[in-house]
């Protein structure tokens, strides 16, 4: 295994620091310790939808349904069964033996209350539009509800399964300031949070019973969770080496591989639905006319080699693979048959010569700090090897959005987290909505995306998505580069479940166990 000198020095230095801490394995205390980059004052993803809040909320709260990624099927969580009465109506039979973490019983009133609160005109939520497809939610019995959508959509279950956590009417309803709820959360989830502190972190304990356990959300096995806010990778690594935490997320590839060489640590790659991708300005909104020639775009695709991107981001020995399609294979509605261009520098040069650009041309790659910058730096060298003189423009998120809106992106290396849905719908909205992201100039792409997001017949929907993604690939517009996987360095005592991920982190807390 190759490790850079810098990474080696970092690990050696941190190992020396770790020696000053007493190793303190927590398996014997049935306590799993990990860190988060953000300070969390309110554990409620409705109020604060940051990824780390959503991840920890998964342990506290439940959705009506979940998604079994391995089988590609929806399964009940708070619902024990459901039926589609007609294309616009879903009816759910709810579990009758579920309790809230304060001991009160869960019932249909809680479901109706949650969605009525979310949809109320005075409720201000960042992602409220994700639920405006609902027309109404009705109580049909003590443990039966009906959800009616405004129009027939094939992804309603996907939205209901994805961080759509149900709230307790008795605890949430009376609060004038709804942020107070997340400071002392009450949920039906597998863990009960006994501490939510912005400075010291989160503490949760396993619920005594979890009768709604399913393949999408199994019953917990670890007794106690301790989550500490730590903002920098160096401190996280030091705590890991000192035995003060059991899991560390997304330590840089070289460093993670070297840490995993220690006998007390292991390395695990957990895939997620997102991707880092390359987008080309097909219609020269940026004024870069050379990019309108499909031979030039194909040359760019042939010049890039994704293997070094995988290595630099995830390190060696991780077996990370380039995505085979624009969508993840476990997404409902994902379909693509057109293959991506393979790496071939000689072919890239021939294509440029055929396009009258044998002497090459200049192009700008827009990227942001982090993974995007890492990939862009390697990509620029690959393009230069084919005769394309690429320079890198590093953007903040704000400047990137300005450039996107103003038509100033030539090549874009960026990331997309998958939208949090086990369905292709959000991906279609992200890439093919009629907004400033349009650098393709193909009205039929908008039409195909809209039709796919309204088509109720599964096979017809797959055909629409396949047609769209195949055309996108043929015109060399967008191509995925690496998966949005998560690298975990963890104690040898920690075990992740096998199979596909349940969320953007690659696991939920109830899916972790001791070896």
Describe each region flagged by the PLM:
Residues 68-73, 161-220, 224-226, 234, ...:
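Gly/Pro-rich hinge or "lid" segments in bacterial periplasmic/extracellular proteins
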Residues 21, 26-27, 83, 128-171, ...:
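Surface-exposed binding/hinge segments that line
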Residues 389-400, 426-492, 515:
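Extracytoplasmic/peripheral linker and loop segments enriched in polar/acidic and small residues
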Residues 35-86, 116, 186:
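N-terminal lobe/hinge region of extracytoplasmic solute-binding protein
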Residues 48, 278-279, 324, 399-454, ...:
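Acidic-aromatic pocket-rim loops
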Residues 488-515:
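Long beta-strand-rich cores associated with HINT superfamily self-processing modules
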Residues 191-192, 287, 320-354, 372-374:
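Structural transition elements
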Residues 33, 107-114, 142-148, 189-190, ...:
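Alpha-helical secondary-structure segments
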């Amino acid at each position: 295994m190759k490790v850079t000198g810098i990474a080696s020095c970092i690990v050696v230095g941190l190992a020396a620091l770790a020696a000053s801490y007493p190793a303190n394995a927590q398996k014997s205390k049935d306590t799993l310790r990990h860190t988060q980059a953000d300070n969390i004052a309110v554990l409620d993803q409705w109020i604060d939808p940051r990824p780390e809040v959503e991840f920890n909320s998964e342990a506290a709260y439940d959705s009506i349904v979940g998604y079994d990624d391995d089988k590609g099927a929806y399964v009940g969580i708070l619902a024990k069964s459901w039926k589609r009465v007609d294309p616009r109506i879903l009816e759910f039979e709810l579990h009758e033996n579920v309790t809230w973490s304060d001991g009160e019983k869960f019932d249909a009133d809680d479901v109706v209350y949650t969605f009525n609160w979310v949809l109320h005109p005075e409720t201000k939520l960042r992602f409220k539009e994700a639920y405006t497809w609902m027309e109404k939610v009705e109580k049909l019995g003590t443990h039966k509800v009906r959800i009616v959508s405004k129009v027939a959509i094939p992804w309603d279950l996907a939205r209901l399964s994805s961080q759509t956590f149900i709230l307790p009417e008795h605890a949430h309803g009376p609060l004038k300031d709804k942020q107070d709820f997340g400071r002392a959360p009450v949920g039906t989830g597998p863990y009960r949070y006994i501490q939510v502190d912005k400075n010291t972190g989160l503490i949760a304990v396993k619920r005594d019973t979890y009768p709604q356990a399913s393949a999408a959300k199994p019953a917990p096995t670890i007794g106690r969770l301790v989550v500490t806010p730590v903002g920098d990778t160096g401190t996280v690594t030091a705590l890991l080496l000192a035995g003060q935490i059991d899991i560390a997320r997304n330590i840089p590839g070289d460093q993670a591989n070297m840490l995993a060489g220690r006998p007390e640590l292991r390395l695990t790659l957990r895939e997620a639905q997102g991707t880092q991708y390359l987008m080309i300005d097909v219609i020269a909104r940026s004024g870069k006319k050379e990019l309108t020639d499909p031979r030039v775009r194909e040359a760019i695709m042939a010049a890039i080699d994704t293997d070094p991107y995988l290595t630099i981001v995830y390190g060696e020995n991780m077996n990370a693979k380039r995505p085979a399609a624009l969508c993840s294979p476990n997404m409902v509605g994902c379909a693509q048959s057109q293959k991506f261009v393979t790496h071939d520098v000689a072919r890239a040069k021939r294509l440029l010569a055929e396009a009258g650009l044998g002497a090459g041309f200049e192009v700008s790659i827009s990227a942001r700090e982090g993974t995007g910058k890492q990939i862009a730096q390697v990509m620029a060298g690959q393009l230069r090897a084919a005769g394309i003189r690429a320079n890198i423009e590093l953007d903040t998120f704000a400047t990137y959005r300005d450039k996107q809106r103003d038509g100033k992106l030539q090549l874009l290396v960026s990331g997309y987290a998958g939208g949090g849905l086990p369905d292709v719908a959000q991906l279609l909205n992200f890439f093919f909505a009629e907004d400033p992201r349009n650098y393709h100039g193909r009205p039929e792409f908008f039409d195909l995306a809209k039709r796919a997001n309204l088509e109720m017949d599964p096979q017809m929907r797959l055909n629409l998505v396949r047609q769209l993604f195949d055309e996108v690939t043929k015109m060399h517009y967008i191509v995925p580069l690496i998966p949005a996987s998560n690298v975990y360095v963890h104690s040898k005592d920690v075990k992740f479940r096998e199979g596909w991920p349940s969320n953007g982190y690659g696991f939920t807390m109830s899916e972790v166990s001791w070896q």
